């Protein structure tokens, strides 16, 4: 089945697409609250454990963050195939696009953005969270130009005085110590990245840039860049201190906030409270531990199972306990529906049920509530007679259904030019359509959705009195609104309609309530939902909207060609194919300036959304290997579903911590005895390439030569100061086992760190580009042993290549989870190049 909604959200147009999946616009069914819905295919996470760990960590980190300058994540839904991350919708686009359009910014505007970046980053650092991938592509702009730090996939929890090992991020923004492959301070590395961003804000260029990756890394290591003379001297001083090669001499966040240029606009900033200063009460015993929160802590790598459990019940203050309490508060917040635009104690009027959604997609009309409408009119008449001296005339009541046979003779239902006593309202029931407005409660909007200002034609006008035009429209170009699509009104809605009509008569003015007759429907919530699901029809509408004939088709919404309203009214005709956008973003120039191109990847021309992370070290990786990796990602992206293709799967279920992660991340099991490594269930990828390592904590698929695997394995082990011992090889299956352990011994005689590694041949699937289909078929003829594999049709007909390689399975025996995570991450980087 196609998935059109996730929880209370209707899925709309595609906003973007990256390596992990698409991001679509979502609307809350009841309030119209906009969100971004990140859709991740779980098959990608099964085939690439590092990607799974990245998403897992990103989810938990975003649950710990609540700041105006950081993107929020509201909740998580999932099906058997997909993860749905409900994110804050940031309508202004990337800071990168803004810089491409504007070029170098004025000092004041650059400072305005830079201050927000530093304040948001200071908050993250106060939570001991390092971003490690700061760049303009990961900084989003809200409608009022507020910075939102996004993409915490490379983020990490860093304890005091702890150094990080993994080289990650984008090379143009990475610090010298990161690209050099040495241990580094994550917070100092973030400061360097902010320095590069500040340089880009002021100049529209990057301080370190080169098409050749090796020359680029050398420039970063040397820290040599040109300082334009037009930059303010104080800003030059701050840039020099931020782009200092020696991290011990590099300026800190606290010192940045005290710098003369930073405080030159006299803004006062509140200091972020360090996580160590937050009060947290310990748990009474293990039985109080929430399993979802516990798995989240394990995903952060804060310790082993026993260590985390002990810290949660200990009276000694620890960051782990504070994180637990913060996540506990976040879990309570997740159950609060008011975050989606509800007002306390407010009746939810405009819910789109599953049945009404089906009618939206089928385009059927529904006028089944005639009796209720008749009762409404009768009640309105009684109330109006009691509260108004209108000569027993209730022409203020609006009948929008020609099937409503009201017994009250005071209502003139079939007169298109019927004036009421207040000259504000009229009745129009011709062909069950309203001209210029509608009182259908299925099109109501919540109070927080603002309506565009419109001009009301006076009652003595020669044109139809019910017509509304925007300020830019002429009298000859009338806005024709959509007919009523859904009249399934509940009793609460009817009562609200009654009260609103009473208030209209008493006050003798136009009420701005969502039920008011003068409210235009073109911006209604139902229209917004339709607009997202019928984007392809806009082209036909644009070709026909020059016609001034007011011809209302049963399921067509038209608009004046001269209207300059900020919202466009879509057509529901099923023949058009152009995407319609309801959000505005900075208009990009047709040709990007040469001095500032996307640098999110190893090659300047690569889209940062599909860019790999910097999984190389400057002295070991060649540009050819990196370029081939980028190309492989591009091939995988190009064969995915089209941006507006439907999502197929079962109905999404709400999940505070993804069941996928709790199922496949063996180290997250709260019930594991004595902190030992519990066994993981076997993983499958559509029946092909099964991972039979039922006890492995981590699995790496590698295509490089087995001898090179051994060489790289020994390099990593030597770097960490571990010892490697090979066990007897199983000749028949060509499987090799080895033990990795640290030289340091605990008091009980066990090594401080130990893991077991198994290396064996493997066959796993890989997408094949259309241009290589013939070559792949010929390759299968030369190697008949591969023809035994049955033909596959995965991912909508995508061709699959069965690559031969090696599976490296790692079992965590003892030692800290954090050290194990670092070790496996380093090993995967060097084995998957």
Swiss-Prot record:
Pfam families: Pkinase. Residues 338-351 have a biased composition (Basic and acidic residues). Keywords: ATP-binding, Kinase, Nucleotide-binding, Serine/threonine-protein kinase, Transferase. Residues 288-329 form the UBA domain. Residues 365-432, 441-459, 528-589 have a biased composition (Low complexity). The keyword Transferase applies. This is Probable serine/threonine-protein kinase DDB_G0277165.
